[in-house]
């Protein structure tokens, strides 16, 4: 619970300011803005079931570990380019990572909560998580204008700082949590790319062909 609260605090150091960066500093059109924001939402919907199957197989913690290490790089990737095409690509990556993290964070809190006090435990988590989000936003809002600028923008510096803070939180706190369910041990590479082996791909194509013949 502590890890997720601090991770969301770190996430909200810069999360509320992506829209301001796009609209006030890059001056992109509202159509481009909607495209960038919708890309993440669509990607999340496409992969959330995929992540769920992997969480059932390898456990919530395994998926949390993978996705928690991916999320900090979302902020860092925003420093690479300000083109709409690049930012849409970053949002694809972001939607992929956040779909797994949010899904498994919620399921892990449910699994870890003592059954006799589950409602109280989850309510306390929600309250402290909301407090962490508020504190993170306040830190970002007050810190941003005082940071040195990268390419003429303090938003980019804020993204860099937030990405580093998120990495520190993951590396410092994640080791303190452990899986509460009995799950099989599986390598991260097998969890992510296991479906890309020839047998799995052949099965996938066979299912598509069978459905097309119905």
Question: Which residues does each PLM region occupy?
Answer:
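Intracellular juxtamembrane helix-capping segments at the cytosolic ends
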Residues: 100-114
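Helix-to-loop junctions at the C-terminal end of transmembrane segments
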Residues: 46-59, 144
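Helix-loop junctions at membrane interfaces in 12-TM secondary transporters
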Residues: 77-91
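Cytoplasmic membrane-interface "Motif A"-like loop-to-helix N-cap segments
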Residues: 57-68, 150-153
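Structural signature of the two symmetry-related core transmembrane helices
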Residues: 62-77, 163
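Short amphipathic helix-loop junctions that connect adjacent transmembrane helices
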Residues: 16-32
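Pair of pore-lining "gating" transmembrane helices in MFS-fold secondary transporters
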Residues: 1-16, 92, 206-212
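A membrane-interface helix-boundary motif in multi-pass transporters
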Residues: 144-164
């Amino acid at each position: 619970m502590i890890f997720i609260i601090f991770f969301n605090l770190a996430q909200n150091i810069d999360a509320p300011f992506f829209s301001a960066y796009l609209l006030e500093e890059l001056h992109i059109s509202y159509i481009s803005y909607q495209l960038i924001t919708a890309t993440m939402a669509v990607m999340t919907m496409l992969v959330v079931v995929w992540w769920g199957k992997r969480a059932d197989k390898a456990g919530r913690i395994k998926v949390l570990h993978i996705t928690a290490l991916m999320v900090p790089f979302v902020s860092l990737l925003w420093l690479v380019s300000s083109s709409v095409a690049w930012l849409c690509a970053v949002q694809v990556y972001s939607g992929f990572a956040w779909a797994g993290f949010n899904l498994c964070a919620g399921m892990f809190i449910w699994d870890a909560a003592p059954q006799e006090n589950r409602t109280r435990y989850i309510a306390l988590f929600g309250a402290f998580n909301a407090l962490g989000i508020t504190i993170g936003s306040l830190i970002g809002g007050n810190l941003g204008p005082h940071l040195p600028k990268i390419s003429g923008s303090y938003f980019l510096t804020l993204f860099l700082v937030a990405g580093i803070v998120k990495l520190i939180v993951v590396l410092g706190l994640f080791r303190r949590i452990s899986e509460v369910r009995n799950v099989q041990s599986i390598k991260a590479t097998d969890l992510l790319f296991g479906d890309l082996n020839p047998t799995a791909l052949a099965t996938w194509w066979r299912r598509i062909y069978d459905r097309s013949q119905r």
